[in-house]
Amino acid sequence: MQYNFKVEAFEGPLDLLLHLINRYEIDIYNIPVAKITEQYLSYVHTMKELQLDVASEYLVMAATLLQIKSKMLLPKQEEDVPDNGEDFIDDPRQELMERLIEYKKYKQVATELKEREQERAQLYTRPPIDFTSFQQEEETSLPLDVTLYDMLAAFQKLMRRKKAKTPVTTRITRQEIPIAQRMTDILQQLEVRGGRQSFYDLFADEEREIMVVTFLAVLELMKNQQIIIEQEHNFDEIFVSSSNKSV
C-alpha cells in the first residue's frame, strides 16, 4: 500500500544537520563528518522507508556529505602546502560549517521575532492578570520543541526493538488501514487515557504496516495541531497529548 506524506510542512536538510549537532552535542566548528554522515543517511533512509515525500535537497545534502567525507579521507598532497612554510589548512568542511552557522543565526532571529509577535499579541488581547499567583510558583523547565527528526529517531528506536523481537521465521499478515482511520483511533485512545500517553504506547500492535500507518497518522495530527508532542530532555521518553482542537 502506498502512503504519501509531504515533509515540506516540517523542515529541510540544514535543520536535520542542526538537529543532529544539537542531539549529539557536536561542536559545529569541528564536525565529525563520518559520524554526522552516518546519522544523516540513517534518517533519510527512514524517511524513504516510510515513503515520505523526501525533497531532492535532502539527497543533494547527502551527496555533499559523502563528498566531504571522501575528501577528509584523502592524504594531504605536497602541493597543498605553501612554500613559505606557513600552516595552511584546506578544510573540506569549511563551506558546510559556514552555511550551518549562517542558518543557525537565521533560525535564532526567526524564533526571536516569533516570540516578540506572540508577546505583542498577548499585550493587546489578554485580560488583566492576578500576579499574586506567581509569588509561590517554582521555576520549571519547559519541554523541548519536538521536531520531525525527534519523531523519526523515536520511530527508528521502535523498529530496532521490533527487529530484536522478530523471530527468524515469521508469518506476515498484511493489513491496510487508512491513515484517517488511524488518526481517529489515536484521538479516541488519548481520550480514554485522560488526554495524554507515551508515544511508544501507540504502537502496541507490532505489525510493521500498522506501525508505519500509526507513525504517519501521528505526523498528520501534529501538522493539524490536534496533538501536542512533549519531551523533557534529549533522549527522554516522548509523550503525546490531545490539544482538543478539531479540524
From Swiss-Prot:
Pfam families in alphabetical order: SMC_ScpA
Domain of life: Bacteria
Biological process terms in GO annotation: cell division; chromosome segregation; DNA replication
Keywords: Cell cycle, Cell division, Chromosome partition, Cytoplasm
NCBIfam families hit by this protein: PRK00104.1-1, PRK00104.1-4
HAMAP family (UniProt xref): ScpA
Annotated family: Belongs to the ScpA family.
Designated name of the protein: Segregation and condensation protein A
Source organism of this protein record: Bacillus mycoides (strain KBAB4)
